[in-house]
Amino acid sequence: MANTASARKRIRQNERRRERNVARMSRMRTFIKKVELAIQAGDKSAAAEAFKVAQPEMQRAAGKGVIAKNTISRKLSRLSARVKALATA
């Protein structure tokens, strides 16, 4: 239990930040799912468009510190490769 005013304030701040981070992470996952669904459906243009929309959202999450930058780079690279493979197939 927090005894000082500053500790209580930190608890409030942490809770607000956690809620924000959860929302950002959820939003990012939703965009990724849209890309993956388009890839599974075999829809080249929809996959490319969904990826185009998902990319800045994922980078924004990394910029805000919700997820590590290297993790986002890896995920973007793999998604991009899958979209590209779909376009050439």
Curated annotation (Swiss-Prot):
Give the matching InterPro entries: Ribosomal_bS20, Ribosomal_bS20_sf
Q: Where is the composition biased (Basic and acidic residues)?
A: 12-22
A GO molecular function for this record? small ribosomal subunit rRNA binding
Biological processes annotated in GO = translation
On whether Ribonucleoprotein is a keyword of this UniProt record, the answer is: yes
Q: Which domain of life is it from?
A: Bacteria
Q: Which GO terms describe its cellular component?
A: small ribosomal subunit
Signal peptide per UniProt: none
Q: Segment Disordered: which positions?
A: 1-22
Q: Which UniProt keywords apply?
A: Ribonucleoprotein, Ribosomal protein, RNA-binding, rRNA-binding
Record-stated family? Belongs to the bacterial ribosomal protein bS20 family.
Q: What does this protein do?
A: Binds directly to 16S ribosomal RNA.
Protein name (database record) = Small ribosomal subunit protein bS20
